[in-house]
């Protein structure tokens, strides 16, 4: 998967706050670039593209992964946009981030890739692993000294519970739309992909 390795604050200035990408907030109230071009009237396509980019950058996923999540959400029963957000939020890297074990989703992805996280007692090194209701997420005993709890400034969501002493968390239920920590209109993302 190709990752975004350039300046993250530039993306935040363009798209707005993205808690999964970086903790930093922008102090400049203008668009990135040398000459700070004022945005003209956005077309419908530009608005939909911007919402799609928010999802892509916040969760650190590629275009193909996002498209595959859209296709999977379309095949399921329910609102496609809400199902898409649920699948993205129930990824293991996103759960580790929301538990406060990492300050950003890229950091939580690295923790998972390096084998520091266990799910239901089994070592899992796949960041896209889909967590389910009742799953127990814990840090390996040998890895507890590298984890800084509370490095994430976001409050713990209601669908998760965390034991900070033992660095264990549990998924109480599948996340609802109102608990997603990202300001996004998921219907515009679905409309963007409906043309493909």
Model-derived segments and spans:
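Ferredoxin-like alpha/beta domains used as RNA- or RNAP-binding modules
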Residues: 1-99, 126-196
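Short, well-ordered loop/turn sites that connect or cap secondary structure elements
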Residues: 111-112, 131
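Beta-rich strand-turn-strand
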Residues: 102-105
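Residues in the helix-turn-helix
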Residues: 107, 123
């Amino acid at each position: 998967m190709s990752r975004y390795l350039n300046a993250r604050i530039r993306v935040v200035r363009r798209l707005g706050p993205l808690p999964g990408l970086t903790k930093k907030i922008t102090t400049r109230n203008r668009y990135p670039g040398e000459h700070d071009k004022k945005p003209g009237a956005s077309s419908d396509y530009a608005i939909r593209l911007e919402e799609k980019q928010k999802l892509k950058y916040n969760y650190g996923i590629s275009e193909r992964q996002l498209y595959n999540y859209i296709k999977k959400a379309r095949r399921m029963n329910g609102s496609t946009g809400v199902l898409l957000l649920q699948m993205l939020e129930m990824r293991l890297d996103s759960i580790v981030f929301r538990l406060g074990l990492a300050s950003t989703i890229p950091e939580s992805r690295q923790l998972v890739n390096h084998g520091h996280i266990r799910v239901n007692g089994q070592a899992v090194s796949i960041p896209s692993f889909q967590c389910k209701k009742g799953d127990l997420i814990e840090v390996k005993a040998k890895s507890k000294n590298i984890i800084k709890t509370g490095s994430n400034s976001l409050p713990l969501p209601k669908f998760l519970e965390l034991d900070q002493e033992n660095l264990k968390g549990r998924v109480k239920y599948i996340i609802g739309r109102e608990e997603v920590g990202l300001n996004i209109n998921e219907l515009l993302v679905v409309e963007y992909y409906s043309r493909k």
